[in-house]
Amino acid sequence: MAKWLRDYLSFGGRRPPPQPPTPDYTESDILRAYRAQKNLDFEDPYEDAESRLEPDPAGPGDSKNPGDAKYGSPKHRLIKVEAADMARAKALLGGPGEELEADTEYLDPFDAQPHPAPPDDGYMEPYDAQWVMSELPGRGVQLYDTPYEEQDPETADGPPSGQKPRQSRMPQEDERPADEYDQPWEWKKDHISRAFAVQFDSPEWERTPGSAKELRRPPPRSPQPAERVDPALPLEKQPWFHGPLNRADAESLLSLCKEGSYLVRLSETNPQDCSLSLRSSQGFLHLKFARTRENQVVLGQHSGPFPSVPELVLHYSSRPLPVQGAEHLALLYPVVTQTP
């Protein structure tokens, strides 16, 4: 009876039945830190703020948990600024007379500003030049620059009456002499052709024999004409034979003469033989005449045999000597003896 009264009248207080624990759906600090770092690592700095997803109410943006603010986004973020906005900002911040500096950043094609047209320097692309020539067939297009020519003050104001300034630079309208050096080859070609025509049509050309008109091979380089040598005179009576003359005296005589001068003297080692003393550009040459078994006279190893010394001298007075060191020389100027 007492138990029933206590339960019915609630004298001792009625306890509620035990309830299950309330689940905790909040994320742990470690999980929130991981997600915040992941968002920072894979964040697109150029993504518009409007297109970003709203943060989770229970995430780091929830104001109910002030301790979670340390996992928010960093303060220094990359923000995309349009080129037009950047130019307007520079114009507002800079002075009225200050020129806008060229944007040195890399821009997307749609952000690039149109550049001013480059100055005309006379150069034209082949395709453009072809298009201009096809579009303007009746108008002469000047593809090359003309040289600058100073004009007189009076001609710059206007040409005098009855005279027309020379603006054309064609060869047939050129007033300069025909032998000027700055003319190209094509301008002188006509003058050269006329000069050759006058030369070939002249009476002197008609009187020349036909064999001379033929194209001949140029003769080998030969020395200039030498003084005449008479091979009929014996060696002792030749004016260039000096008899017993030593080498020093021969060089003293040749030192006063020019290149190609020569004399014949008796040899110092063998008075029965003769020697040739020659003046060259490099000094003096002393060559000894030798005789073969047939009693022929030779000069060096490559010389042909001759009956006498005067004939050998006559032969090499018009031909180079076949001697090493004197291949370009000939016996041109004999040094005659001085009679008392």
From Swiss-Prot:
Could you tell me the superkingdom of the organism this chain comes from?
A: Eukaryota
The GO molecular function terms of this record are:
phosphotyrosine residue binding
Residue ranges of the region described as Disordered: 1-77, 94-186, 198-230
Pfam families per the UniProt record, alphabetical: SH2 (PF00017)
Q: Where is the composition biased (Basic and acidic residues)?
A: 171-186
Alphabetically ordered keywords of this record = Phosphoprotein, SH2 domain
* Record's comment on post-translational modification: Tyrosine phosphorylated by ABL.
Biased composition range(s): Acidic residues: 98-108
Keyword ATP-binding listed? The answer is no
Q: Describe its function.
A: May function as an adapter protein.
Please identify the protein, giving its name as recorded. SH2 domain-containing adapter protein D
Source organism: Homo sapiens
